[in-house]
Design a protein with these regions (language model features):
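Core subunits and conserved enzymes of cellular information-processing
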Residues: 1-132
């Protein structure tokens, strides 16, 4: 049983990239689907597909690599808030990730979004992870 599904999601993506895999399969949930959509919108993954397997479903993610150097597009996936120590922030408290080059994913009352979207809507929430 997985106690932290977001950390499991990030670890699966990180391990697949370190192993050079093109596609990674992750058990689906609504939160993981939204995080995947954000990764796609920010340009960190090539494409994704949700598959229903008559249980909870799967998310298939096509990972993105640099054409010349074969380096992964995602340099780091860092879990911030965890079950034992939740991290909340108001719009004024959002930290810049890698001097503005990265993105923080935040769970707000308006849904899961990036830190920039949360700041523009003036809502705070739980900082789930940093990606750069």
């Amino acid at each position: 049983m997985v106690t932290d599904p977001i950390a499991d999601y990030l670890t699966r993506v990180r391990n697949a990239q370190m192993a050079g895999h093109r596609i990674v399969e992750i058990p689906a949930s609504n939160l993981k689907k939204r995080i995947t959509e954000i990764l796609y919108d920010q340009g960190y993954i090539l494409k994704y597909k949700f598959e229903d397997d008559n249980k909870q479903g799967l998310i298939k993610i096509a990972l993105k690599y640099d054409a010349q150097s074969k380096e992964p597009a995602i340099k780091s996936l860092e879990r911030v808030s965890r079950p034992g120590l939740r991290q909340y922030a108001s719009p004024a408290e959002f930290k810049r990730v890698k001097n503005g080059l990265g993105v923080a994913i935040v769970s707000t009352s308006q849904g899961v979004m990036t830190d920039k979207q949360a700041k523009s809507q003036n809502v705070g929430g739980e900082v789930l992870c940093y990606i750069y």
